[in-house]
Curated annotation (Swiss-Prot):
Name of the top EC class for this enzyme: isomerase
Pathway assigned in UniProt: Carbohydrate degradation; glycolysis; pyruvate from D-glyceraldehyde 3-phosphate: step 3/5
Gene: gpmA
The protein's name in its UniProt record: 2,3-bisphosphoglycerate-dependent phosphoglycerate mutase
Domain of life: Bacteria
Organism: Buchnera aphidicola subsp. Schizaphis graminum (strain Sg)
Subunit structure as annotated in this protein's UniProt entry: Homodimer.
Length: 230
């Protein structure tokens, strides 16, 4: 029986997660542990008899591959999958590719935590000629450079995630379709904050673990009434 539930999953551990680097829009592979995490997430969903009508993911392979492993485990590899840059991880600007502990040593733990977790604070931004600018990547060639980030706060991340939710995912939910989203820590934080009306200061405390299914339940007005880890 179809229910008003949405499943969110952050990708499995990536090779840069393992090295404690700011990853952002860098297209990094899953680690061996990340692959195992994705398979376990799929097995858990299968055990709980989850079945989906649609899936959404980002343009980054750590999320795409996590979704692939999950759907393989569910024997749902045929499922329609929509990929969008709007579900990409938050762009960490000039921090991308750098080690988090080294940045803490340089700037202090409080400042780095604000860059990582706060709602409105933007990390140091890159320039358009920086190789880390998404406009230099062929996969974003059909997107206006003015829309692509030089570095984002959670607030800026939410400004691209929420329109995608309203245009593509919410209409599917309203038709009582069962939807799976596999994305990233901050794009999912932005969505969870929006759907559950979490205070901007409280969102600082939310850290989403890798490859752990999150269930959101909606009422008949399609408002989120609760969320929890499976």
């Amino acid at each position: 029986m179809k229910t008003n539930k949405l499943v969110l999953i952050r990708h499995g551990q990536s090779k840069w997660n393992k090295l404690n680097k700011f990853t952002g829009w860098h297209d990094i592979e899953l680690s061996d542990n990340g692959i195992n995490e994705a398979l376990k997430a799929g097995s858990l969903l299968k055990k709980e008899k989850f079945f989906f009508d649609y899936a959404h993911t980002s343009m980054l392979k750590r999320a795409i591959h996590t979704l692939r492993y999950i759907l393989d485990t569910l024997d749902q590899s045929w499922l329609p999958v929509q990929k969008s840059w709007r579900l990409n991880e938050r762009h960490y600007g000039a921090l991308e590719g750098l080690n988090k502990d080294e940045m803490i040593s340089k700037y202090g733990e409080e400042q780095v935590n604000l860059w990582r977790r706060s709602f409105e604070i933007i990390p140091p931004q890159i320039r358009l000629n920086d190789k880390r600018f998404p406009g230099n990547d062929i996969r974003y060639s059909n997107i206006d450079n003015n829309e692509l980030p030089l570095g984002e706060s959670l607030e800026l991340t939410a400004k691209r995630v929420i329109p995608y939710w309203n245009k593509f995912i919410l209409p599917q939910i309203k038709k009582r379709n069962r939807v799976l989203i596999v994305a990233h820590g901050n794009s999912l934080r932005a969505l969870i904050q929006f759907l559950n009306k979490i205070d901007n200061k409280k969102i600082l405390e939310l850290n989403i673990p890798t490859a752990t299914p999150i269930i959101l339940e909606f009422n008949e007005e399609y408002n989120s009434i609760k969320w929890y880890y499976l």
